Amino acid sequence: MIDTIIIGKGAAGITAAIYLKRYNKNVLVIGKDLGALEKTVKIENYYGFPTGIDGKELIQNGITQAKHLGIDVYDEEVVQIDNTLEYFLVTTPNHEYKAKTVLIATGKKRSPINVKGFKHLQGKGISFCVTCD
């Protein structure tokens, strides 16, 4: 049985997995996309990247680090979670997993707006960043 299944393979999910693994927990990460960080064009205020890094590359680096630590990261969609007295049963279209705990790290979806030019200007003046906005 898995100690913790993390649903969501964005920055929060992968970071949680890395920390749990450091505490010798058996961890599995399941998710379909890379979260909001994937759409970030350039991160220039993060330690260790003097010329910046794009969000997709940063999250891929995190996934690589997690896999290097022995964490399985699956590209699947969770369709159901059941709780028995003994464990959680997490179901995807192709698998069922048993875990002692489940951590939901699916993030917050950005609400699209229907404004001409909006998509084209994302990352080029329109941003979703607390310190940028």
Model-assigned labels for residue ranges:
Residues 49-50, 69, 93:
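Short N-terminal micro-motifs specific to bacterial/archaeal maturation
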Residues 19-20, 66, 88, 122:
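Generic detector of bulky aromatic hydrophobic side chains
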Residues 2-60, 65:
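Beta1-alpha1 glycine-rich phosphate/pyrophosphate-binding loop at the start
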Residues 53-85:
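Substrate-binding N-lobe of the ribokinase-like
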Residues 22-25, 67-72, 104:
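Generic secondary-structure signature for well-ordered alpha-helical cores
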Residues 1-5, 28, 73-133:
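FAD-binding core/adjacent interface of flavoenzyme oxidoreductases
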